[in-house]
Amino acid sequence: VSMEPYPTPNMVEQNLHEILEEVSFTDRIIFGRTNYSKVANAYEGHRHFYNECATEVISFCQEHGIDYHIKEKTITEE
């Protein structure tokens, strides 16, 4: 399951954990940020937001034995 581009809350308000539970049947999750979007980059704390989301995806996948790939530049220095 590809979860990219994943929007920031100023684009769409959604619950990442609920989405992960819905796709827990899969054997692989690909997660990535919304790139090249002025709207996503305008979200205050977008780097922190994506770092937190990536951490949640990694933890969920490890707990459920799901392979995962976090796209390049999703995890960044804050």
Regions found by a protein language model. Give the residues of each.
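Conserved, mostly hydrophobic/aromatic
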Residues: 4
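Short acidic loop-to-helix transition motifs that present clustered carboxylates
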Residues: 8
